[in-house]
Amino acid sequence: MSFGYAAEKFASARSVLMLPHPQGEDQSIATAFSECRKGLERFDRTLFDDSSSIWIKQLDQLMKTEGIEDPDREGLFLIKARQLSIDDQLQFSTVVDELQCWFSRRKD
């Protein structure tokens, strides 16, 4: 997995978190979750330094969907997005921004 691809996915996540949210804030957050997951899948996590490792751990915690039920098949990320507090939303936005910058500085 390339740093460039991850930077692109995190840039997309950051973009959907910006106003306005035509499909609602929760849907924007769920879409950003999906973009972050795509940016990190198959990425060797041993490549992260101390700072980025902390952001990744924060991101993993914010995106954690274990124990969430989805009887109406809305999508686990959408349900998780609805559960985030304002502080969680702020932390998520900050982590996405930090990781996008980190990946961008290391592009192939």
Predicted regions: what they are:
Residues R14, R37, I56-L59, T65, ...:
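Generic N-terminal initiation segments characterized by hydrophobic and/or small/turn-forming residues
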